[in-house]
């Protein structure tokens, strides 16, 4: 077992090193399993690893997983889509290779819009500012789920106008997913069932 994990804003294994390792062991005839913390097809650098394997002539396949947005929404007792509320949901990253990621903020600011922001802790103030700039209501619910579905899961519930400050105050250190437009439906039952921390800041 080789630890090749990544930690946002912390020590991480370089992607090039991961590519080299899976190619090296694959060429040596080993059966290599590259586990991901979610679904490997979403914000997981899958294409880079496939390109390295194909370049070396190593066969590969993909085992689908459950993406963090689905796990996190289930953990707070919510559905990502609801008839009459939203007919679509966005999976978006808080930042890209150029910095904070730009999105269709006008659509995200519309009533009923739901979005899941991956790797978004550092971009909270940016997302907040953009949505307010494009006319989003100040009381849009926002939920941040740290370590979704794990025993050490924490949930921060807030609203758009207090989003960045409340997130900073919560001092989350683990991997977190932000859901815009939804708040926990069953926080109290989740506390008893999963022994999670619920930080109510709204």
Segments from the language model and where they lie:
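Short, mixed-charge, low-aromatic patches
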Residues: 5-10, 27-28, 62-65, 80-87, ...
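Active-site donor-binding loop signature of nucleotide-sugar glycosyltransferases
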Residues: 4-6, 93-94, 147
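Class I SAM-dependent methyltransferase SAM-binding "motif I" and its flanking Rossmann-like core
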Residues: 37-111, 154-157
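Short, hinge-like loop/turn segments at secondary-structure boundaries
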Residues: 1, 20, 51, 77-83, ...
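A contiguous loop/helix-start segment that scaffolds small-molecule binding in enzyme catalytic cores
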Residues: 17, 27-33, 45, 49, ...
């Amino acid at each position: 077992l080789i630890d090749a994990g990544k930690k946002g804003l912390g020590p991480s294994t370089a992607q090039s090193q991961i590519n080299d390792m899976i190619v090296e062991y694959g060429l040596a005839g080993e059966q290599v399993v590259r586990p991901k913390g979610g679904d490997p097809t979403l914000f997981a650098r899958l294409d880079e690893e496939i390109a390295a394997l194909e370049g070396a002539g190593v066969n590969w396949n993909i085992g689908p997983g459950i993406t963090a947005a689905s796990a996190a929404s289930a953990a707070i007792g919510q559905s990502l889509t609801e008839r009459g509320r939203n007919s679509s949901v966005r999976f978006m990253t808080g930042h890209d290779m150029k910095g904070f990621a730009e999105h269709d903020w006008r659509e995200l600011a519309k009533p009923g819009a739901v979005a899941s922001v991956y790797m978004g802790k550092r971009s909270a103030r940016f997302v907040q500012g953009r949505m307010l700039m494009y006319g989003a209501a100040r009381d849009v619910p926002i939920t941040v789920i740290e370590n979704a579905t794990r025993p050490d899961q924490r949930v921060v519930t807030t609203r758009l106008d207090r989003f960045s400050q409340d997130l900073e105050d919560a001092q989350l250190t683990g991997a977190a997913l932000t859901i815009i437009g939804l708040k926990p439906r069953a926080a109290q039952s989740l506390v008893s069932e999963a022994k999670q921390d619920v930080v109510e800041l709204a």
